[in-house]
Amino acid sequence: MYPLLENINSPADLRLLPRTQLPQLAGELREFLVESVSKTGGHFASNLGSIELTIALHYVFDTPHDRLVWDVGHQTYPHKILTGRRERMHTMRQHNGLAGFPKREESEYDTFGVGHSSTSIGAALGMAVAAKTLGVDRKSVAIIGDGAMTAGQAFEALNNAGAMDTDLLVILNDNDMSISPNVGALNNYLAKLMSGRFYAAMREGSSKVLGIAPPLKEIASKVEEHVKGFFTPGTLFEEFGFNYIGPIDGHDVDVLVDTLKNIRSLKGPQFLHIVTKKGQGYKLAENDPVKYHGVTKFDPANGLASGKGGAGKPQYTQVFGDWLCDMAKLDKRLVGITPAMREGSGMVRFEKEHPDRYYDVAIAEQHAVTFAGGMACDGLKPVVAIYSTFLQRGYDQLIHDVALQNLPVMFALDRAGLVGADGPTHAGAFDLSYLRCIPNMTVMAPSDENECRQLLYTAFQLDTPTAVRYPRGTGPGAEIQQQMAALPIGKGVVRRRGKQVAILAFGSMVHPALAAAEALDATVADMRFVKPLDAELIRKLAQTHELIVTVEENVVMGGAGSGCGEALQAMGLAVPTLHLGLPDDYVEHGDPALLLSLCGLDAAGIEKSIRERLAG
């Protein structure tokens, strides 16, 4: 079925093929990718768009000696297939299977681990400098696209690289399509300058003015050429010190091979601009690349199923999105901000209903936080919808620009806790630890869908920095009350009364704790707030129980349990404690329920840990 692909187990095998067979290989690779991802799910449209580029890179460069650094990793399935992992593609994003992103431990061809965007240029530059310093003759290549060029980190690296005499190649895979449509001045610059009215007017204007004097036609031609050069995409990158080449067709493997061979012999920083189509070769993905960016299992003949197949429980992301729209109707000061995650953060409806109050700042988490701070200074009430793992990228701004000034910015932290198939790069394992130590912050963790809605409302009422963290996927199925009411700040609630053991559960761990408590006859408190903690409730439970257990879907170190321990110590209560949470390690990808079980954070694991502690 795949006569060429089946004989390629490494790039060395690929380089044995005559160039005339590379287009056939691209076709086979595309067919294999459709078949494979349709069975496992995963990133799809970006991978279809990077096939010819991947073939050309491994054909021209001596990988793994030469370094390929992929940005984000959404487009690296073809790379994995060509580097000896074809037979394991059926394990993609499953526990103990292939990771969905490049991972150094997985293959020597994965030169740099990624998952977050805009890191490739800086990493590849570091490798280029290392090669030069150590006297190693090798090339370093950064492949960046999927909206990652909108992030400031990419331009920091470009600025540094252009001033250094290193053999670095940056390839911009320009498919004009990130997860959400690219926004901002840079995308406008790349996408519109060549066809824009301003460029056309400049060209026409210079011709008209200089056309008055016929002998100056030659000068006019040169001026027009100069105007064209000044306003083409390459100008920006040449100003950074790169030799700009392109744009070229990213789906013409012959052109790619010829161009890369020429560039390989050049010295200094090079910038190759290629144009590709996201979803190339699979019409449904070409027509709707957002829908097919990341997919579940599907029938290749019919594509992804339409609709959701019935009512079912809403995901927490939807609970947030509905609350945001409802709250916007009640308070005209509300504005919504997302760093290029409109769909993932549940803001599609909000953008449609309130386009003048919706701000997608592109992949710019640092800017998103400071931007929100500026809005809050002058009377708006910004809500920053962001994944827990991505807020890490704006941590200094969170402290310096928001919390230090005690500004009313609300952070809606999606994907808090483990995220399953996306693995450790996307897990929200640290937010309780890095938020609770910041003065002026109020941190909340709802236990179900209705509590999520009410705590979102509660957070919005405060005129100080707040964060509400909630997990990926669906909750336990609590009935959502449309009427919103602010919950008492820093107060938890006892959900079950038992004896001997009191479990202080936070957020997503409340319901597993309740299930464990049935077997233990333990007390369970839904703490709701990580900061401020309900010190009075902790005191009462400590005075009436023999063991205090804290449970959270966050690392134990510095998390909510640590806060409870600090509170007990401050009150002088020497009650035995047990802190349960994520380990001091990175939890790998896999089914979320399986991962929680392996971490001892399902009902059975919680019960087991408590019984072992009681047994001494």
From Swiss-Prot:
Keywords: Isoprene biosynthesis, Magnesium, Metal-binding, Thiamine biosynthesis, Thiamine pyrophosphate, Transferase
EC numbers for this chain: 2.2.1.7
EC top class named in words: transferase
SMART domains linked to this entry: Transket_pyr
Details of cofactor binding: Binds 1 Mg(2+) ion per subunit. Binds 1 thiamine pyrophosphate per subunit.
Alphabetized InterPro entries for the sequence: Dxylulose-5-P_synthase, THDP-binding, Transketo_C/PFOR_II, Transketolase-like_Pyr-bd, Transketolase_BS, Transketolase_C, Transketolase_CS
Cellular component GO terms held in the UniProt record: cytosol
Cofactor: Mg(2+); thiamine diphosphate
UniProt entry tagged with the keyword Nucleotidyltransferase: no
Gene3D superfamilies: 3.40.50.920, 3.40.50.970
Residues engaged in binding Mg(2+): 146, 175
Reactions this protein catalyses: D-glyceraldehyde 3-phosphate + pyruvate + H(+) = 1-deoxy-D-xylulose 5-phosphate + CO2
Superkingdom as given in the UniProt entry: Bacteria
Family annotation (Pfam families): DXP_synthase_N, Transket_pyr, Transketolase_C
Subunit architecture: Homodimer.
Protein name as catalogued: 1-deoxy-D-xylulose-5-phosphate synthase
